[in-house]
């Protein structure tokens, strides 16, 4: 499983005075509702763990639209998290959407200096998405992980602003 070797970042060990003041936006795609609901629940749980009770949450149609939404939000927030699911089909569409979302979100983060948590699942099967969505019985919680990474990075970057 891809989570092997992942860092153990506990948001509760970060300074709550720092994390609770962070402005967090979560941009969530709409395809694959069950998986997306799990990702979003995990992301909101991580925000709450960090003392952020009401992050801004917006929905976009799909993963292809995540970068433009993140770009619009980034200047107004300390961290942005992008959540989406792309499942391989029988055409090259999978590669195009995955590449566009990945490079677009990376570009937003580097260009704005705002961490963008990458919670876009790129799966060969729906089961792989379910296994990573933080649902009961899931092996991983990528929504939680994406928020944790973005907020931990935002705390580090605040030290250098």
Curated annotation (Swiss-Prot):
One of its GO terms (cellular component) is riboflavin synthase complex. This is 6,7-dimethyl-8-ribityllumazine synthase. The active site is at residue 93. It is an enzyme of class 2 (transferase). Belongs to the DMRL synthase family. InterPro entries: LS, LS/RS, LS/RS_sf. Its EC number is 2.5.1.78. Coiled coil: none annotated. Pathway: Cofactor biosynthesis; riboflavin biosynthesis; riboflavin from 2-hydroxy-3-oxobutyl phosphate and 5-amino-6-(D-ribitylamino)uracil: step 1/2. It comes from the Bacteria. Keywords: Riboflavin biosynthesis, Transferase. It catalyses: (2S)-2-hydroxy-3-oxobutyl phosphate + 5-amino-6-(D-ribitylamino)uracil = 6,7-dimethyl-8-(1-D-ribityl)lumazine + phosphate + 2 H2O + H(+). It comes from Pseudarthrobacter chlorophenolicus (strain ATCC 700700 / DSM 12829 / CIP 107037 / JCM 12360 / KCTC 9906 / NCIMB 13794 / A6). GO terms for molecular function: 6,7-dimethyl-8-ribityllumazine synthase activity. Catalyzes the formation of 6,7-dimethyl-8-ribityllumazine by condensation of 5-amino-6-(D-ribitylamino)uracil with 3,4-dihydroxy-2-butanone 4-phosphate. This is the penultimate step in the biosynthesis of riboflavin. (2S)-2-hydroxy-3-oxobutyl phosphate binds at residues 90-91, 132. The gene is ribH. It holds the Pfam family DMRL_synthase. One of its GO terms (biological process) is riboflavin biosynthetic process. 5-amino-6-(D-ribitylamino)uracil binds at residues 31, 63-65, 85-87, 118.
